[in-house]
């Protein structure tokens, strides 16, 4: 049986609000859609942190668990938890094999965390990952720049995922949006 992949997460900080959206598609290999309603965006740490994953589903659950443990260990300090998780992820021979990326955010900070040790904070308050990530990122930047007065963070997140779903075959329109 092939690898299961789950893709396209978009996150935005906008006008004091924050939202993260993920589509529901899980694809086995490059040919078969196995699930349409997966939940790839979650609230963690008593609802104060959002986390979303793109990549292998089983690997992502391992990383969610590991990140939540780091949040508890560092009392909700998002940046410290992300850095410590990235160090552990990169430094452990078994964890290095995990194929997933995470976006984590709270009301003030948003970070991309990867297994190669990157912990990246965007300049513009927008991040997107997964197969439709570039489409969602482009749409989100345009919406934030040109329609920001008229849209909420949640609306930007949902619209960006919808546009990605129109273009990317690995992204569907079963969109879940979480806000803080």
UniProtKB/Swiss-Prot annotation:
Q: Which reaction does it catalyse?
A: ATP-dependent cleavage of peptide bonds with broad specificity
The intrachain disulfides are none
What does the entry give for GO biological process? proteolysis involved in protein catabolic process
- Which superkingdom does the taxonomy of this entry point to? Bacteria
| Record's keyword annotation contains Cell inner membrane | no
Query: Binding positions for Na(+)?
Result: 165, 168, 171
Q: Which GO terms describe its cellular component?
A: HslUV protease complex; proteasome core complex
Its EC number is 3.4.25.2
Activity control mechanisms:
Allosterically activated by HslU binding.
Which PANTHER family does the record cross-reference, listed alphabetically? ATP-DEPENDENT PROTEASE SUBUNIT HSLV, METALLOPROTEASE TLDD
Similarity comment = Belongs to the peptidase T1B family. HslV subfamily.
* Subunit text: A double ring-shaped homohexamer of HslV is capped on each side by a ring-shaped HslU homohexamer. The assembly of the HslU/HslV complex is dependent on binding of ATP.
Q: What is this protein called?
A: ATP-dependent protease subunit HslV
């Amino acid at each position: 049986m092939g690898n299961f992949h789950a893709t396209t997460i978009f996150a935005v900080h906008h006008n004091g609000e924050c939202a993260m959206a993920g589509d529901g598609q899980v694809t086995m290999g490059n040919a078969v859609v196995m699930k349409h309603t997966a939940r790839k965006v979650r609230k963690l740490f008593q609802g104060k942190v959002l986390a979303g994953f793109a990549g292998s589903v089983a690997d992502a659950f391992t990383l969610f668990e590991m990140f939540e443990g780091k949040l508890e260990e560092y009392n909700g300090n998002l940046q410290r938890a992300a850095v410590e998780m990235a160090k552990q992820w990169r430094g452990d021979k078994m964890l290095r094999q995990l194929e997933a990326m995470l976006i984590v955010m709270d009301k003030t900070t948003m970070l991309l965390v990867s297994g190669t040790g990157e912990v990246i904070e965007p300049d513009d308050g927008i991040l997107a990952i997964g197969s439709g990530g570039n489409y969602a990122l482009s749409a989100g930047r345009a919406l934030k720049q040109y329609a920001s007065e008229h849209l909420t963070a949640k609306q930007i997140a949902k619209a960006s995922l919808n546009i990605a779903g129109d273009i990317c075959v690995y992204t569907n329109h079963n969109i879940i949006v979480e806000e803080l």
